[in-house]
């Protein structure tokens, strides 16, 4: 029986990078006889233009029926002035919450070929391999009430709410421990337990879950210190688990240790490892349509999809090897280019990965 993959290119550079990822996926599908069927739909700004909402009901239903979702990027200045609740990003938040995609896995891996592209000294980041496990469907991005109001004195005031339940913390903590167990048995839980009530509960529950993982070394770190330590000595970390907002910020910070956010994939999983896969970067409207965006994060998201949702480790490994081979050849998009390398565009980079995959 065939497996269904829903492709959502999205906005900005999304359609450009997705085109290259789909080429790689179709080759892997054929070569490894994976039995995938691909369908395409719209999300974000593209959905607003077509349906008047950032995620149409029929698109959400197709996503529910699919075995995995492959996403490009959403958003852009074209839609910045519309009502907040129907902006493109709301489509992304909705599909995450409606599909129950509570666990976001964001690897930060420095390819040895890109050591010079990192913002830190090579000796600080050489061999870097961090996995950030981010809670994705709770916390301040979804908490109610949230409001902007006018006080009696005429001054505007806005507030948000940061709620976490014990069950939400427990399930993401287990993902963190499980990931640590298949890596190097080290987990750092990041919170702000010295200030926030939600973080105090977070730390208590993580400690309780740790009793089921005696082989995993657990440490705790306040988020401000974690942000500093990621720059000072990033290789002290292996797996980090944290809440929605902290994970959003720390994973972007970690991305720059690797040279470019254009290299980093991500997976968002439900309790059964059904997932949505997307690059960590945004829609980059400033370079959209120019054919210069880096498609490698999206291509590597395909690899994560094969690994986590379909248990196709051989095909996933092959795609990662193809990307590494292309970097060995000195091909670089502008975001990772350095002296002595050949600068290429989006399509040429995608074609190079396809060629490398064919020759493995």
Swiss-Prot record:
The keyword Oxidoreductase applies. The keyword Transmembrane helix does not apply. The record marks 141, 192 as: Important for catalysis. SMART domains: Iso_dh. GO terms for biological process: L-leucine biosynthetic process. It is an enzyme of class 1 (oxidoreductase). Pathway: Amino-acid biosynthesis; L-leucine biosynthesis; L-leucine from 3-methyl-2-oxobutanoate: step 3/4. Its EC number is 1.1.1.85. Mg(2+) binds at residues 224, 248, 252. GO terms for molecular function: 3-isopropylmalate dehydrogenase activity; magnesium ion binding; NAD binding. Belongs to the isocitrate and isopropylmalate dehydrogenases family. LeuB type 1 subfamily. Homodimer. This is 3-isopropylmalate dehydrogenase. The gene is leuB.
